[in-house]
Amino acid sequence: MAELDQLPDESSSAKALVSLKEGSLSNTWNEKYSSLQKTPVWKGRNAGPAVEMPFRNSKRSRLFSDEDDRQINTKSPKRNQRVAMIPQKFTATMSTPDKKASQKIGFRLRNLLKLPKAHKWCIYEWFYSNIDKPLFEGDNDFCVCLKESFPNLKTRKLTRVEWGKIRRLMGKPRRCSSAFFEEERSALKQKRQKIRLLQQRKVADVSQFKDLPDEIPLPLVIGTKVTARLRGIHDGLFTGQIDAVDTLNATYRVTFDRTGLGTHTIPDYEVLSNEPHETMPISAFGQKQRPSRFFMTPPRLHYTPPLQSPITDGDPLLGQSPWRSKVSGSDTETLGGFPVEFLIQVTKLSKILMIKKEHIKKLREMNTEAEKLKSYSMPIGIEFQRRYATIVLELEQLNKDLNKVLHKVQQYCYELAPDQGLQPADQPTDMRRRCEEEAQEIVRQANSASGQPCVENENLTDLISRLTAILLQIKCLAEGGDLNSFEFKSLTDSLNDIKNTIDASNISCFQNNVEIHVAHIQSGLSQMGNLHAFAANNTNRD
């Protein structure tokens, strides 16, 4: 019976015959058959011959090990060839996530972001202001140290052992200590201050700014849509618009879009522009800079005020006030240490700006309404066009009145500058005169370079000199740090003088080839944002 138990069953024999007939006997059956033929040898304590025992499949004792009875294979195992795994590209046929599943994930994510700690974590992880972006999104400390320690290392594809060797040579970094955090905060403040100095063009030598990135962000201007960090009761990120810039304290005055938030003063390191912001290479700041000006002042000309001011007559408060006669005639009186006439002009300026702000708000709402009608392919009514044109004309008149008042206010600022211990700045007329003299000298040398004049017509020579003077004025404005409306006015006056001297048939050519390009350059040089209306022609002809 023992021998019968050791034989394979009929089903396995039939399978073996079939496989033999087909010429492919499986290895597994051979291993099974050979294992059935082998019987373990029981080694007893006596020195007698070994007794063969039948093979048992039952559970062995935990003290018994059959490793000694197994045959040791001296051959090394066959190594499979490594197959390079090529990442498969995602195709359009792959299943997209279910809409309900996406909504569920979005709902859970929204609930997560409602938590104060999760919201702050997102702010700390992804919110970087314009002044901090080049500092944090550039090379980290390890990359900087790697460049300094191994300048000849051109590759980044190193093995783990090679990277470990480099880390051992560089030493263990000091992290998460109070001294480390204090040092990092101090270094960050210094870099921010250096960027602010570059933005304000108060630096002539950039050799001390080698630790800054190659691209320096330009300061934000008035009217820029931003996302700002608001602290206090309403702690979080909110969208708004810049209404004022304070370069002295490095802050922005932001009016938030959400009702109830109002206007707040936000530091520049917590304000991020919603649109891609422009940067300037740090090498451009090393060019010749013009000294900063404390006051942006017009030419110091004697101004005779008119007997009746159209703005005062049309003003419901100042026009009907019983103190109008006293206030209008008080040229030498002071109030709070300032001339009364100066305070009147400041009041007018504030009122005009407030009215202009309301008109701009209405115009923005009408633009939104017009875009909505256009998206629905609906016609824009005549009444809508009439209201839109009325607002545009009123804005044009406000800009003219604003330019008049600004002229007077800045004239008083220029007169008050010596009393405050400030040095008056050079006048734009002086800059224009110097540019014209230099242009005439350049044209004269170029015209007589060959020994005889190339252009003999004096009118053409004068025209070339004036056009060259415009280029020199643009160069002076580009090299200057602080731009103001009166410097742009000198450029506009030069264009108007040239336009008045040329023939009427050439005015269209002059506008298309000269004036429009100068206007584009002037718009690019100006950093006054929505206040570019201040750079309009002075309509004060008194």
Curated annotation (Swiss-Prot):
GO terms for biological process: DNA biosynthetic process; DNA-templated transcription. The modification Phosphothreonine is found at residues 96, 304. There is a cross-link at residue 21 (Glycyl lysine isopeptide (Lys-Gly) (interchain with G-Cter in SUMO2)). Keywords: Acetylation, Cell cycle, Coiled coil, DNA synthesis, Isopeptide bond, Nucleus, Phosphoprotein, Tumor suppressor, Ubl conjugation. GO terms for cellular component: nucleoplasm; transcription repressor complex. The modification N-acetylalanine is found at residue 2. SMART domains: DIRP. The modification Phosphoserine is found at residues 65, 95, 309, 321. It is found in: Nucleus, Nucleoplasm. Component of the DREAM complex (also named LINC complex) at least composed of E2F4, E2F5, LIN9, LIN37, LIN52, LIN54, MYBL1, MYBL2, RBL1, RBL2, RBBP4, TFDP1 and TFDP2. The complex exists in quiescent cells where it represses cell cycle-dependent genes. It dissociates in S phase when LIN9, LIN37, LIN52 and LIN54 form a subcomplex that binds to MYBL2. Interacts with RB1. Belongs to the lin-9 family. Acts as a tumor suppressor. Inhibits DNA synthesis. Its ability to inhibit oncogenic transformation is mediated through its association with RB1. Plays a role in the expression of genes required for the G1/S transition. This is Protein lin-9 homolog. It comes from Mus musculus (Mouse).
